[in-house]
């Protein structure tokens, strides 16, 4: 069985880790970085860029470069958070047929899980390149405060990426795992994990206990805000720059998509710089132009100014901390360690606020970017059966219930209940001779059902006629270890029952997921063909280069007919290389290799006569070229690099 990898699918950045023995290893991607921007770009020729390459071209392709898509996952188009994002994002957020928030790119409507799957596929490939084998199983993390629809949508994204998602685990819990297994302190410890990432905020109170040599991680409570994070901090800076520029130059940059993309990049850079310096300068030449000519943007921002701009955002994280402490039934003074996770916790003001609330400095020995992926990898090792000294007890973040008479939310499972869990309760009919009941399932803390998030509904039909209040209908709730809900209803008199896994009343249908999986596979096939074409092209170009070089030096030793033949073959291959027909390129490469065989022999004979190293190099070039065309085995792992010969002899 292959390794189960751990993936932190973040709003802004993602990260993948594996376990090597009992040591976690965060894997570097193809660009050599340990985290990958969660940015996906759809190019005109159908190519999809993920990570740093997508981020690099965002300024020139803002409408088709998608970032922070995690903020839309599992959400309805009408939700106020989505409506807020519509005005801010350079790309187009649209309403899907099922009422979900989707994205439109180059005339094609895409579901957020489908877009996130591209990031997951890159993480999967990163792990495969490192391990040298196929990876099919993963543990993926989500914000602790994600509701059922958001968890389900994340699982769907994994499937579309070709992964069997063994478990969805909460980010703060994963960070606690990474922290707890690294430490040798004995006895029980209560820790607070404060996780402020790119798009979401979570706070979890977790107890780490030693039980007969086994480390038990029990989540006591969790709280948060799934629409608060670094993206909001960036937006405050962008709004400030736009306001200042309008005052100075009288031009409103908020309507200019290209300018906005440059501002986003500059805002993020300024925010990061202000964590280590007191002042930074934003310098964007040619940001826009009007009748009087081009306009340049030059603005100084101090750390104090940034802190004033985002003060209320930081303050918004404190209320959930208060609630989590209360729900956990502990006092602030009971907390042994405070762990900071997520890039935003590098901001000094955030650290200061956390210290103020918890009355102690946060630990500095946890990597805020990597701890979550490491925790996911540890959980993967536990699920794979390779580790038995860890037990994880997580909770459901929000109460679950059904709508009963008068639109009341009757709670079946309270928030912060340890999962997996089951609960059932008996209900009855509201009218005489009622033949069916509709079970509407909600998640949230409000007293009235309409104030909560509706997860789904289903009918139990065929109830025998009876006065109201007589039939006995048992409704059962079952939450699995992923935090995903399964609901059943059963008429006790007839034994009739109906069960559903709560697929959000929207969400992706099985058929849609299957289609997206097939699309993804087709894309992979397309990518493979493209790669093979590039390889053939490189081979052809290398042969043209080496043959021309040898021809320049040894051509006069050939018969005129031979030389013409080679030159004609070079010309034909050069023409074919301009096209995209791989078979034709291969055929012409082979033809040139055959035509230049005599030339290779001349080079070789000359080299033998002279016995010179330089000649050997030349011959190797022509010979290698000739062999390449003659179907010599081609090593996929060899990448042609461009190089220049340096002549050191003065």
From Swiss-Prot:
Keyword Cell inner membrane among record annotations: no
Keyword Transmembrane assigned: no
A single MF term (Gene Ontology): ATP-dependent protein folding chaperone
Gene3D superfamilies documented for this protein: 1.20.1270.10, 3.30.420.40, Actin, Chain A, domain 4 (3.90.640.10), Substrate Binding Domain Of DNAk, Chain A, domain 1 (2.60.34.10)
Induction or repression: By stress conditions e.g. heat shock.
Region annotation (Disordered) ranges: 609-638
Residue ranges, compositional bias (Low complexity): 609-632
Residues recorded as bearing Phosphothreonine in the entry: 200
Pfam family, one: HSP70
Cited PROSITE patterns: HSP70_1, HSP70_2, HSP70_3
Keywords: ATP-binding, Chaperone, Nucleotide-binding, Phosphoprotein, Stress response
HAMAP family: DnaK (MF_00332)
Function: Acts as a chaperone.
Similarity annotation: Belongs to the heat shock protein 70 family.
Name assigned to this protein: Chaperone protein DnaK
């Amino acid at each position: 069985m292959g390794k189960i990898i751990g993936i932190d699918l973040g709003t802004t950045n993602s990260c993948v880790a594996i376990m090597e023995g009992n040591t976690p290893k965060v894997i570097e991607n193809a660009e050599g970085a340990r985290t990958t921007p969660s940015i996906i770009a759809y190019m005109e020729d159908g190519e999809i860029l993920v990570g740093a390459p997508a981020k690099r071209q965002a300024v020139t392709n803002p409408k088709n470069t998608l970032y922070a898509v995690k903020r839309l996952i599992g959400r309805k188009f009408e939700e106020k958070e989505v409506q807020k994002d519509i005005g801010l994002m350079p790309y187009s957020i649209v309403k899907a047929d099922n009422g979900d928030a989707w994205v439109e790119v180059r005339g094609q409507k895409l579901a957020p899980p489908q877009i996130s799957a591209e990031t997951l596929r890159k993480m999967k490939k990163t792990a495969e390149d490192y391990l040298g084998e196929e990876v099919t199983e993963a543990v993926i993390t989500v914000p602790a405060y994600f509701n059922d629809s958001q968890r389900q949508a994340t699982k769907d994204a994994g499937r579309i990426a070709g992964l069997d998602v063994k478990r969805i685990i909460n980010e703060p819990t994963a960070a606690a795992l990474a922290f707890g297994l690294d430490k040798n302190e004995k006895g029980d410890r209560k820790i607070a994990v404060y996780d402020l990432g790119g798009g979401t905020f979570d706070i979890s109170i977790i107890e780490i206990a030693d039980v007969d040599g086994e480390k038990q991680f029990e989540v006591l409570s969790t709280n948060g805000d799934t629409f608060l994070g670094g993206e909001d901090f960036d937006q405050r800076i962008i709004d400030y720059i736009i306001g200042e520029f309008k005052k100075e130059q009288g031009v409103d940059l908020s309507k200019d998509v290209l300018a906005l993309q440059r501002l986003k990049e500059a805002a993020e850079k300024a925010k990061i710089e202000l964590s280590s310096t007191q002042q930074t300068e934003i310098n964007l030449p040619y940001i826009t132009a009007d009748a009087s000519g081009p306009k340049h943007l030059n603005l100084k921002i101090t750390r104090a100014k940034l802190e004033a701009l985002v003060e209320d955002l930081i303050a918004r994280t404190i209320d959930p901390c208060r609630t989590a402490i209360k729900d956990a039934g502990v006092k602030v003074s009971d907390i042994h360690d405070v762990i900071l996770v997520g890039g935003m916790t590098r901001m000094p003001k955030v650290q200061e606020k956390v210290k103020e609330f918890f009355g102690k400095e946060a630990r500095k020995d946890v990597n805020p970017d990597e701890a979550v992926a490491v925790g996911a990898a540890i959980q993967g090792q536990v699920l794979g059966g390779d580790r038995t000294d860890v037990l994880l007890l997580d909770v459901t973040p929000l109460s679950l219930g059904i709508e009963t008479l008068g639109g009341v939310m009757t709670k079946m499972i309270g928030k912060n209940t340890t999962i997996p869990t089951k609960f059932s309760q008996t209900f009855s009919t509201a009218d005489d001779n009622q033949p069916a009941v509709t079970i509407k399932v909600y998640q949230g803390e409000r007293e009235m059902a309409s104030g909560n998030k509706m997860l789904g509904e289903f009918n139990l039909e065929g109830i025998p006629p009876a006065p109201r209040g007589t039939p006995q209908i048992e409704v059962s709730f079952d939450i699995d270890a992923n935090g995903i809900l399964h609901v059943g209803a059963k008429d006790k008199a007839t034994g009739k029952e109906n069960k559903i896994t709560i697929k959000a009343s929207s969400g992706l249908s099985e058929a849609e997921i299957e289609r997206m999986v097939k699309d993804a596979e087709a894309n992979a096939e397309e990518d493979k063909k493209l790669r093979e074409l590039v390889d053939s092209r490189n081979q052809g170009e290398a042969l043209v280069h080496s043959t021309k070089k040898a021809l320049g030096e040894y051509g006069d030793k050939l018969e005129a007919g031979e030389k013409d033949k080679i030159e004609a073959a070079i010309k034909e291959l050069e023409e074919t290389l301009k096209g995209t027909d791989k078979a034709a390129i291969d055929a012409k490469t082979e033809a040139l290799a055959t035509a230049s065989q005599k030339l290779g022999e001349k080079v070789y004979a000359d080299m033998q006569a002279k016995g010179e190293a330089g000649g050997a190099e030349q011959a190797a070039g022509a010979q290698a070229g000739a062999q390449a065309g003659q179907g010599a085995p081609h090593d996929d792992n060899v990448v042609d690099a461009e190089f220049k010969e340096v002549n050191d002899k003065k």
